[in-house]
């Protein structure tokens, strides 16, 4: 029967159930005359055909349908997932004596005729008895129906961030009280309920029903936008009621299957998805994305995900005057959204997960497990990404943070003991397992919104350190040669200008050019090194400098005149310029981020070893023998360079994917999974190729590339204008002018030793303290010592007695070298290989290196002239003022690159926006809309 037929039968045959099957219409003939006429014709036809029993069966079905009410006639379609109504009893279950009737009707007509009258009388008697029994047990049957078909109950509604249970209906309480009294008495003699509505009661017409439906619709519309869940009230078993045991056995089994954990969780996700998109805005996001209007998409998405009444964000986004303000507003909203989606406010997971069939007995007895389920706020806290505090706006950090937040919220909906969220907090105790744990990437916030704890990224691959150390050691031997070449002039010029030790005459001007030509040649080498590392590769370019180094030192050692010495110094300076450019680039592209700072400082440390070696050897050797020693140093450097591979990034830039994979396997270890890193390199290279132009100079002048290039140039400028090379080149002369009682060569050895020790201290601290902290310490140390040195030379120039503080210059030099070697010595070269974008890394590094050697040449060449012009005190004070300016440059311009991948650094430096595909996938939880 349809819903309309049910209503007709319920109105027309209301008294038929109590009065028997004779007159189905009763007193309602004036309301349902067509039904009465049809029933009369049907009775006439069946009686004439000898099938009066069939008429009784039809009339009984109509009587049974009086109490059958479909859910569709009460509540129309609604997007909320209502539970299904209890299954209706089949008429044959109410009339068991009619179940065999179809077989009897299939018998031949001639066999049925002799028994027909007897069967009619027997069935008529049974039917009359059944109707009388049905009338007596009608109140009990109605109560059973109420108990079986439990009324729908609304889940708790959100009101001012609190959860309140709606009050129970008075009628429902009365029914529960009556049921309790019946069960307590255990008697079947029950007081009959009032009969069904009769014709004296006004019939509810279509208009009245439509009014009720409209009220229901309005009430449901008011519920939209809130997190509402519909479920049945808890089932109450009645073991004393034997009349319903057989009918409820199958229903209870089905209910246990339907109430399984997975079904509850899926239903919970569907309800959550429906409640989140309460304004229906997500359906037009595809059209918005097609028009590439990112701000409009963000505004729409935020409003659609806003469930706590913060529509003011849309106006904030419209009023954003700049991109930075827009990002700030969006980050603030993310925090609000994550807090609004926090289970401690919007979910009551204990009710959703109550009665889960997958929970074991062991879990049920676990007090901690129960506490976590019944108090979701103890399971998780909202996790937001404070990109400003972390100094990172990279796509990778954002996605990683979002995935971590989604994972935590997903686990909070899962009551299974094996993946409880509170066990994830033990990650903080495993920080010692790997250096990677020292990289903070998200912060948990407390209820007041202030950062309190740090969460650490779990390790994915073990750091296979030995191959990376071998690679760093191989290229660092080249830096040893560079340091030896830089310090050569300080001890060599003393013996070279001695006519007794030299077969040719060296004037003061020639000596000035011997010391100053190498920085000038380094400028040329830095310019040429950029294209070389792009076309030949990083490793091949470094390898190509070994043989010219040997030739340059042989030219100096075998020189018979000044031009041969200058030629050898120029060739050595050219190789120094190329090596100083390519060494940090190679290490930056081969070493993992966790140890890039430590291994990245090895070239600087070996360079200082070369300086110290040159100072010590210069004490016992003349300039010619010292040059032969310098020619022997590139030999082990040449041998070790054949053992290491090219950088994977350069292979990817040339389309050699298989060679890049082999290089990564060699660097990371055979057991390491290199595919994610390789895919990241290929994706980064693809992005660089899309944005690259054929004109290299135009690439350098792009706004997105100017920022990292300017930072690199600024670091190089303040490194050289701090006066370090002037101090190194003229250490002996400075100590003579200061009137020190120590031998000049001894002072030089002391300075070199301090430089070497300070560099290794920096190696230990750079991946723990960070780049900027070391730059701050370095600046402060240099500023103090330069001003003190200036004061010392000022007092000496004005005739004051400084003999009592004769060791002051040495102490100041030691502190100055210590501060420089901690920060401004190695970090500018290290950060040059980190912050420059991949597509311009070669050309930009060439410009930065050339600029560095230009500053070196200017400072070295003009230092003696500067002393003559403004005095030694004026020169040191000038360097101190420049270091003060450098401090502000570091504070406001230099980013922190500690623990970040090159891709993360590049995205932040270039200010690259997030891809629309990744933005579109940002949802509160990973469910299907």
Swiss-Prot record:
Give the highest taxon in the source lineage. Eukaryota
Where is the protein localized? Cell membrane
> Keywords assigned by UniProt?
Cell membrane, Glycoprotein, Membrane, Phosphoprotein, Sugar transport, Transmembrane, Transmembrane helix, Transport
Topology of this chain in the membrane: Multi-pass membrane protein
Gene3D superfamilies given for it? Answer: MFS general substrate transporter like domains
Extracellular topological intervals = 484-512, 563-569, 618-624, 730-745, 794-804, 861-873
**Which Gene Ontology molecular function entries are recorded, alphabetically?**
sugar transmembrane transporter activity; trehalose transmembrane transporter activity
Bias-annotated ranges (Low complexity): 85-141, 168-178, 237-254
Is RNA-binding among this UniProt entry's keywords?
A: no
State the function annotated in the UniProt record. Answer: Low-capacity facilitative transporter for trehalose. Does not transport maltose, sucrose or lactose. Mediates the bidirectional transfer of trehalose. Responsible for the transport of trehalose synthesized in the fat body and the incorporation of trehalose into other tissues that require a carbon source, thereby regulating trehalose levels in the hemolymph.
Instruction: Identify this protein by name.
Output: Facilitated trehalose transporter Tret1
Q: Which organism is it from?
A: Drosophila grimshawi
């Amino acid at each position: 029967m349809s819903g309309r037929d049910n209503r007709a039968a319920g109105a027309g045959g209301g008294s038929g159930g109590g009065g028997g099957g004779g007159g189905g219409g009763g007193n309602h003939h004036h309301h349902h005359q067509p039904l009465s006429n049809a029933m009369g014709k049907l009775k006439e036809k069946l009686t004439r055909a000898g099938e009066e029993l069939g008429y009784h069966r039809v009339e009984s079905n109509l009587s049974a349908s009086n109490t059958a009410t479909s859910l569709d006639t009460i509540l129309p379609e609604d997007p909320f997932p209502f539970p299904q109504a209890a299954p209706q009893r089949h008429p044959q279950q109410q009339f068991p004596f009619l179940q065999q009737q179809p077989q009897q009707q299939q018998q031949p007509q001639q066999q049925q005729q002799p028994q027909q009258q007897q069967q009619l009388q027997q069935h008529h008697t049974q039917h009359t008895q059944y109707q009388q029994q049905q009338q007596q047990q009608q109140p009990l049957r109605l109560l059973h129906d109420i108990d079986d078909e439990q009324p729908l109950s609304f889940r708790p509604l959100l009101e001012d961030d609190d959860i309140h249970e709606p009050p129970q209906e008075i009628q429902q309480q009365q029914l529960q009280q009556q049921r309790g009294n019946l069960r307590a008495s255990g008697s079947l003699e029950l007081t009959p309920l009032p009969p069904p509505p009769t014709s004296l009661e006004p019939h509810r017409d279509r208009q009245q029903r439509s009014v009720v439906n409209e009220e229901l619709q309005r009430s449901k519309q008011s519920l939209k936008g809130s997190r509402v869940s519909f479920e049945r009230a808890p089932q109450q078993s009645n073991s004393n009621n034997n009349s319903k045991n057989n009918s409820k056995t199958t229903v209870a089994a089905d209910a246990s299957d339907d109430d399984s954990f997975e079904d509850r969780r899926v239903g919970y996700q569907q309800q959550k998805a429906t409640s989140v998109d309460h304004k229906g805005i997500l359906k037009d996001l595809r059209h918005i994305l097609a028009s590439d209007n990112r701000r409009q998409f963000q505004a729409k998405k935020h409003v659609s995900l806003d469930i706590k009444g913060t529509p003011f964000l849309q106006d904030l986004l419209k009023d954003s005057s700049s991109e930075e303000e827009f990002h700030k507003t969006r980050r603030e909203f993310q925090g609000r959204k994550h807090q609004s989606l926090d289970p401690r406010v919007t979910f009551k997971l204990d009710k959703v997960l109550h009665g889960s069939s997958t929970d074991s007995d062991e879990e049920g007895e676990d007090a901690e497990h129960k506490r976590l389920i019944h108090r979701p706020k103890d399971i998780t806290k909202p996790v937001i990404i404070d990109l400003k505090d972390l100094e990172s706006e990279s796509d990778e950090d954002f996605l990683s943070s979002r995935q971590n937040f989604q994972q935590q919220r997903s686990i909070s909906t899962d009551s299974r003991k094996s993946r409880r969220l509170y066990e994830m907090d033990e990650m903080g105790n495993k920080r010692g397992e790997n250096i990677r744990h020292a990289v903070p990437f998200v912060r948990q916030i407390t209820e007041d919104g202030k950062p309190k704890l740090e969460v650490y990224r779990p390790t994915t691959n073990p750091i296979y350190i030995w191959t990376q150390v071998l690679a760093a050691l191989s290229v660092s031997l080249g830096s040893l040669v560079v340091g030896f070449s830089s310090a050569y002039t300080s001890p060599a010029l003393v013996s070279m200008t001695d006519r007794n030790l030299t077969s040719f005459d060296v004037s003061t001007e020639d000596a000035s050019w011997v010391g100053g030509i190498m920085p000038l040649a380094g400028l040329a080498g830095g310019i040429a090194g950029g294209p070389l590392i792009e076309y030949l590769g990083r490793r091949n370019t470094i390898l190509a400098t070994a043989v010219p180094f040997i030739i340059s030192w042989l030219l100096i050692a075998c020189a018979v005149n000044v031009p041969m010495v200058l030629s050898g110094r120029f060739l050595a300076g050219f190789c120094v310029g190329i090596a100083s450019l390519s060494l940090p680039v190679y290490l930056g592209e081969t070493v993992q981020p966790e140890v890039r700072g430590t291994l990245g400082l090895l070239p600087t440390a070996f360079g200082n070893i070369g300086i110290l070696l040159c100072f010590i050897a210069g004490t016992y050797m003349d300039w010619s023998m010292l040059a032969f020693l310098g020619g022997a140093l590139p030999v082990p450097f040449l041998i070790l360079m054949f053992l290491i591979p090219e950088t994977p990034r350069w292979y990817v830039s040339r389309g050699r994917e298989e060679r890049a994979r082999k290089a990564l396997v060699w660097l990371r270890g055979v057991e390491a999974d290199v595919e994610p890193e390789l895919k990241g390199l290929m994706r980064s290279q693809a992005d660089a190729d899309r944005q690259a132009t054929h004109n290299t100079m135009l690439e350098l002048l792009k706004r997105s590339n100017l920022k990292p290039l300017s930072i690199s140039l600024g670091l190089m400028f303040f490194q050289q204008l701090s006066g370090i090379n002037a101090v190194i080149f003229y250490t002996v002369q400075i100590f003579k002018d200061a009137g020190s009682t120590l031998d000049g060569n001894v002072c030089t050895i002391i300075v070199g030793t301090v430089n070497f020790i300070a560099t290794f201290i920096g190696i230990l601290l750079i991946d723990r303290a960070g780049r900027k902290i070391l730059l701050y310490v370095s600046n402060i140390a240099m500023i103090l010592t330069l001003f003190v040195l200036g004061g010392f030379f000022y007092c000496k120039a004005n005739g004051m007695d400084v003999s009592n503080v004769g060791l002051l210059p040495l102490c100041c030099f030691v502190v100055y070298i210590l501060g420089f070697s901690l920060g401004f010595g190695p970090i500018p070269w290290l950060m040059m290989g980190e912050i420059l974008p991949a597509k311009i890394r070669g050309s930009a590094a060439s410009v930065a290196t050339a600029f560095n050697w230009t500053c070196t040449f200017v400072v070295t060449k003009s230092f003696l002239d500067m002393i003559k012009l403004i005095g030694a005190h004026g020169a040191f004070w000038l360097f101190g003022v420049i270091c003060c300016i450098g401090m502000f440059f570091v504070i406001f311009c230099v980013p922190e690159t500690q623990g970040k991948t090159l891709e993360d650094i590049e995205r932040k430096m270039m200010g690259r926006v997030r891809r629309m595909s990744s933005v579109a996938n940002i949802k509160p939880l990973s469910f299907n809309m």
